[in-house]
């Protein structure tokens, strides 16, 4: 069972998905499941994501990463996509990462360690906002 499952909705993020995926695949925590959910994006987001997956695939076995891309049958909106993604998860903990965001390489290991140490059902962290314009 993965320690953490990460749900990443995909829609109209071809400018951002590469940076997002790289930040996820460079996590220091092992045993992560990444569930990318394509909400019928009209742009090249999925093609870009697949290129990043191929680039990082050699490290997936070493880090025990599971990566999947699921496609919605029709554009359904963020809440429905998130719920569908969560329904596919098998990790001890589930988190979300928006596909126009990126995370520090130690984020999930820190959150997981706190959860284990405190026997928490939920952990939270701060974030920084940047102007992507």
Task: Explain the meaning of each model-derived region.
Residues 1-133:
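Nucleotide-sugar donor-binding/catalytic module of glycosyltransferases
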């Amino acid at each position: 069972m993965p320690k953490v499952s990460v749900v990443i909705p995909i829609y109209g993020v071809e400018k951002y998905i590469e940076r997002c995926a790289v930040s996820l695949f460079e996590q220091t925590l092992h045993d992560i499941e990444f569930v990318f959910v394509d909400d019928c994006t009209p742009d090249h987001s999925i093609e870009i994501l697949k290129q990043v997956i191929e680039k990082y695939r050699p490290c997936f076995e070493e880090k025990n990463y599971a990566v999947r891309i699921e496609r919605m049958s029709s554009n359904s909106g963020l809440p429905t996509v998130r719920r569908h993604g969560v329904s596919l998860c098998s990790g001890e903990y589930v988190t979300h990462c928006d596909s126009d965001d990126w995370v520090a390489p130690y984020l999930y290991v820190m959150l997981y360690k706190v959860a284990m140490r405190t026997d928490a059902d939920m952990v939270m962290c701060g974030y920084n906002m940047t102007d992507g314009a």
